[in-house]
Amino acid sequence: MIFAANLKCNHTRASFKIYAEILNKTMGAKCDDIIVFPPSVAFLENENNFMQGAQNFYPCVNGAFTGELGKEHLDEFGIKCVLIGHSERRALGDEELIKVKFNFAKEHGYKIIFCIGENLDTKNSGKTLEFLKKQLEIIDLNYEKLIIAYEPIYSIGTGVSAQTADIAKVLEFLASLTKVPLLYGGSVNENNIKEILSVNHCGGVLIGSAALKVENFIKLIKG
């Protein structure tokens, strides 16, 4: 199972160092199925027992791109995993860059967690599967380092996860399109994680607020 934590705009370099130390000690040995996405200012240079990922990046090595992170910066911290397509990035106008980002990350051999998800209007209109398929049309579903995370927008940060039957329907559909690992994200917590992980084709979870405290993240990993 893959356990990924998106810390979003939380944690400082100092607090994430403590987070990492506790997680490293608890894990004991390296495991690339445990992935943590800290804010870029909190990236750690030292080796960790988990995989450190980037929440965002710009598809360049370096250059005149004010305020952006290029491959050169990710390389300095040994970053080999990137998050692409999160709804909070799409809402900020990232949509047009998604295909370019994916192709750049693929070209340079990054592990990619590619996020897809529909809003409540799309769900209620019965067009979820059609919408998700369209989101996936711009990427290579056969890329060997691809992971797809289904995160319904109406569940992100709301405390209300999607219904298990809905998750199962979507993951079944996605499994018919690709053989890559499939994750669920959207208000994953200690009360629902076991049920979510029991869904057919679910290969793990992408966790947000429930992973902000390392002790909580460890509980979720241990089940």
Swiss-Prot record:
Catalytic activity: D-glyceraldehyde 3-phosphate = dihydroxyacetone phosphate
Annotated InterPro entries: Aldolase_TIM, TIM_sf, TrioseP_Isoase_bac/euk, Triosephosphate_isomerase, Triosephosphate_isomerase_AS
Active-site feature positions: 86 (electrophile), 151 (proton acceptor)
Residue numbers binding substrate: 6-8, 157, 187
GO molecular function terms noted in the UniProt entry: triose-phosphate isomerase activity
Pathway involvement of the protein, from the record: Carbohydrate biosynthesis; gluconeogenesis; Carbohydrate degradation; glycolysis; D-glyceraldehyde 3-phosphate from glycerone phosphate: step 1/1
Any Gene Ontology biological process: glycolytic process
Record keywords: Cytoplasm, Gluconeogenesis, Glycolysis, Isomerase
Coiled-coil features, chain-numbered ranges: none
Any one Gene Ontology cellular component term annotated for this protein: cytosol
Keyword Cytoplasm (UniProt): yes
Compartments (UniProt record): Cytoplasm
Entry EC number(s): 5.3.1.1
Main location: cytoplasm
Functional description taken from the UniProt entry: Involved in the gluconeogenesis. Catalyzes stereospecifically the conversion of dihydroxyacetone phosphate (DHAP) to D-glyceraldehyde-3-phosphate (G3P).
Assembly notes: Homodimer.
HAMAP family in alphabetical order: TIM_B
The family this protein is said to belong to: Belongs to the triosephosphate isomerase family.
Protein name stated in the entry: Triosephosphate isomerase
Gene this protein is translated from: tpiA
